[in-house]
Amino acid sequence: MQDGIVRVWLERKGRNGTPVCIVRGLALDGVALAALAAQLKRTCGTGGTAKDGEIIIQGDHRARVVAELEARGLRVKRAGG
């Protein structure tokens, strides 16, 4: 999905009902992706990881994640969940 829009998903499947936010569609290399993941984790005050070209943030923090990404000038869309 490389249409220039970053999508923020809420997912519970396979996580015992615990919600996580998944950020997909970022065109960043591994180092930049990890740095953005660290900033999002600080903004949300929670844990998370960056792997397979996605950022996973623990908990339902879609509003904060969308606001932070839009502040960085990215086109963001809430999707799923």
Name these PLM-found stretches.
Residues M1-R42, T49-D52, A63-G81:
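Long, charged, low-complexity intrinsically disordered regions
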Residues G53-Q58:
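A generic structural motif
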